[in-house]
């Protein structure tokens, strides 16, 4: 049974927000929130058409950040604080793409969790 598609409400947001970038070895997730933590826009490499090993490239990270930033910019966001988590390859490209999309980056903070010798890491790949 088909559902009725509703038009998404355009809500104006405060000009200051936070960008959470999670760059894993397999994918890149970018979530833009207001200062209270409510999601304004989000994007991922898979959502932007990248499949498989192309999802963890710097270019995929750039496209993903641009898509999320453009949507937030259209809703009225201008200044962002960036929080980066993970060891992925597209961390720097994501920040540059945010600045290129018109958002003014105020602070950059690395919140990658570091173990105090916790779980044993996966074994090294031999190709």
From Swiss-Prot:
GO terms for cellular component: ribonucleoprotein complex; ribosome. It comes from the Bacteria. Keywords: Ribonucleoprotein, Ribosomal protein, RNA-binding, rRNA-binding. One of its GO terms (biological process) is translation. One of its GO terms (molecular function) is rRNA binding. Located on the platform of the 30S subunit, it bridges several disparate RNA helices of the 16S rRNA. Forms part of the Shine-Dalgarno cleft in the 70S ribosome. Part of the 30S ribosomal subunit. Interacts with proteins S7 and S18. Binds to IF-3. Belongs to the universal ribosomal protein uS11 family. This is Small ribosomal subunit protein uS11.
